[in-house]
Amino acid sequence: MDINKMTYAVQSALQQAVELSQQHKLQNIEIEAILSAALNESESLYKSILERANIEVDQLNKAYEDKLNTYASVEGDNIQYGQYISQQANQLITKAESYMKEYEDEYISMEHILRSAMDIDQTTKHYINNKVEVIKEIIKKVRGGNHVTSQNPEVNYEALAKYGRDLVEEVRQGKMDPVIGRDEEIRNTIRILSRKTKNNPVLIGEPGVGKTAIVEGLAQRIVKKDVPESLLDKTVFELDLSALVAGAKYRGEFEERLKAVLKEVKESDGRIILFIDEIHMLVGAGKTDGAMDAGNMLKPMLARGELHCIGATTLNEYREYIEKDSALERRFQKVAVSEPDVEDTISILRGLKERYEVYHGVRIQDRALVAAAELSDRYITDRFLPDKAIDLVDQACATIRTEMGSNPTELDQVNRRVMQLEIEESALKNESDNASKQRLQELQEELANEKEKQAALQSRVESEKEKIANLQEKRAQLDESRQALEDAQTNNNLEKAAELQYGTIPQLEKELRELEDNFQDEQGEDTDRMIREVVTDEEIGDIVSQWTGIPVSKLVETEREKLLHLSDILHKRVVGQDKAVDLVSDAVVRARAGIKDPNRPIGSFLFLGPTGVGKTELAKSLAASLFDSEKHMIRIDMSEYMEKHAVSRLIGAPPGYIGHDEGGQLTEAVRRNPYSVILLDEVEKAHTDVFNVLLQILDEGRLTDSKGRSVDFKNTIIIMTSNIGSQVLLENVKETGEITESTEKAVMTSLNAYFKPEILNRMDDIVLFKPLSIDDMSMIVDKILTQLNIRLLEQRISIEVSDDAKAWLGQEAYEPQYGARPLKRFVQRQIETPLARMMIKEGFPEGTTIKVNLNSDNNLTFNVEKIHE
């Protein structure tokens, strides 16, 4: 017995047989041990052949085990188990060797062991009974005319079934979603497949536009016989490249598997069309030192027309992999797959609607499909239709399905209240005082009411769930009947088709309508129901908001109030700049109402004015008002962009330079947060060429980064701040704080000298910030002191400053050319520093209030006024 003349599977079975003999304490390796091991091998050919012959494999395995248990086990020291092969087991191998010669093979394989067992082993004979000829036929079919010329022949058996999936068969079984549209691309593919040579289309398009769907559409047309006569008998197999490569341990094993697949395709005489998704993976697949890659193995068959192949890949990967190999490229014919428009996407969604309704058990409104197509097109800019719209609908359905599976909020709250009262009741039962008894009586009354409420709600929820389950069941029956109708029409079973089309399906549709009408009448409007089972445009809007951070869902009352009073909220933080605040808040209101220009940013403003008057503060307060956090503001300090080449930091370093993979500071920030406030601070400090990059942002709301990706700025507010013309403003502003027309012209002249006209012309508004007046200073003092009190609150201390002291602080710190910043420093020196010294020296207890007054010498006095007990 030469173990080197056996395949790896047989060698492994013999090794397992030795281990079985050791477990049963047998000195000899019995025939049952070998056959049991062969049956339990992973991916066992022995087992798979018997299963296909409808033999009870589990019972056969138990019979082998029972037979092994009848052999006498040997106990003792230094006994070596499984060292010798029994006479019957030896006969098994000898007979298998004779079958190897009969089949003209080079190695003993699993099918030889099976044939040998059918002749020699009584247990196997008993279970196989009269199926010997059936098994011989299955072995012949599995081998497919191949000879065992390697130690791993199983990879060559039924290679297509192992490494691919039959799309036509999946269509027949109703496992595939319908393909809507794409008629021109499918026709193009059919034309190319009908050629004599080079009949290999490759579908090229962006990810998510429906390349795979075109092949699925072709498979569906083949089933419906809606193809030219030359394609009627064809079947489409999708090749799984990852399965082909996975587990190829030995050199040449990958090539052997691929050759087996190609041999099956070739021997089908053109009946099999091979579909390879991500076909660029073929280039270089399986390439090791001196080995041939998969792409080169395909070329001869592709050129001769022996292999019908459909490829699919993206534009970038086609350019990167396929175009480099011109010999491979010329063997394929390109079919461009463009992104469908919104109208086509809505049609696709309407076609898929029923499938998603049946799968999720929900009802999808048509306006939800329209919203999915429109909102995904407008807001999800880094992906492609129809994929992103289908994803939105699927996610919204899953959200509603999850809600349907759990208790409604109202019932959940009652359940928790009942549980809380029951715990309280059990605690009070142990008390004997009158107060506890009184409380127990009150509590039991409340508990009885809550339980009654709970029972009513539970009954209502279960009633709704039952009705929804009936609706789901009826929809599933209707879907199955429609699938059965398609099968009957395809198989020309006209009697069954007529029965389904004119009897079963209309009856099911009528029953479904009645169920829906009853449900509607009993439960009232959707809003009155405990359980939602309808997907509306609101759910779609919520999902878009979750994915992008852009608020596209309907305005709730709290947000409505917030938007209407946005200017008031901003005025509280930004003092004395009414025009600027109103312009910015108006832009936000227009955007949220949905009437802004959809192809431009929400607003783009240039704030001009002296330092410290609130230009940056307005941008910060806007971010805080819209997003409840200043962190959502993208702040770019333009003083860092003084050199001409610094523009690459905004959009990313060009290819070949360090940092190319990291992306740009501006583009990456906006890609992550498409709905944000962008503050370009101190723009006049930057190099003038840096502004050229802003032209596309301000005009069309987009910017292309260094990797060629288009970044969407349509949902951003762009605020630029500058000190240009601040000297003119300081010198010429009226005492009332108004800016004269001549002053405005002088500032614009300074501005035109610095900025190019095309930049200024693209901005929504140029806002002049007036210098702060004395009145403004007193309001800013209040604001600074409020912030100080918030910080002191952590230590349970508060400070109260008299009106005289506030007025004095405002007057003393008033410097028009420097704005509010000197006031901050002055408050630090006059109040914060003395207060800090007092706190460290005296250590105020919690609840202390410190009163600050102005004395006759114009000095501030600090008094510890009261202590709360």
Curated annotation (Swiss-Prot):
InterPro entries, per database record: AAA+_ATPase, ATPase_AAA_core, Chaperonin_ClpB, Clp_ATPase_C, Clp_N_dom_sf, Clp_R_dom, ClpA/B, ClpA/B_CS1
- Region (C-terminal) residue ranges read 772-869
Which residue ranges does the record annotate as region Repeat 2?
85-145
Location of region: Linker: 340-549
MF terms from GO for this chain are: ATP binding; ATP hydrolysis activity
Which SUPFAM superfamilies does its entry note? Answer: Double Clp-N motif, P-loop containing nucleoside triphosphate hydrolases
The record, for Pfam families, names:
AAA, AAA_2, AAA_lid_9, Clp_N, ClpB_D2-small
Q: What is the protein name for this chain?
A: Chaperone protein ClpB
Phylogenetic lineage: Bacteria, Bacillati, Bacillota, Bacilli, Bacillales
